[in-house]
Amino acid sequence: MSLESILVSSIMTKKVIVQTDNQTIQAISNTMYENNIGNVLIIRNYVAQDSIKQDKVVGIITERDVVRIVGSFDPTLYHLPVREIMSKPIISITPTCSLRDAMETMQLKNIRRLPVIEPEGKLVGIITSRDLFKIIINNQDTMSTFINSNLVPLSGEFYERFTQYWSDDILHKTR
């Protein structure tokens, strides 16, 4: 099994938690806590040309964003609309992209999550670096392909995340 043969659609998480861009960081933080997740995709409702109401992914809030806000010790930020502090523009990938495409995008953009959006704009899932690591670690062929691939040289942070996940996985299996 090669990195190019595994499609994003086969490993993405299909249940994605979203909130509208008028929510506060406090509301988003509560959503993250209640759902035990590290990010929330931010959507904006709009009316398409055919007068059908649709949602468009316009940003993302991650646990890092929340820590940055809380760490500022400025309680007024908790009540700002999330659209003022979310990461944007959104970097996404399509469901037909390969695992290799997802890895390269994450590494080049220095991100850990990619919303999976169909070409016509419909959100269908999310893929994380953790999802990618899990596939690589749990399949010898994929691990071998990954190690021997000519991927863009791994950045320090990407390599750290991979080795951290790998060591956590090994520790978990030995308990």
Language model features: what each stretch is:
Residues 19-37, 42-44, 93-110, 117, ...:
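The conserved cystathionine-beta-synthase
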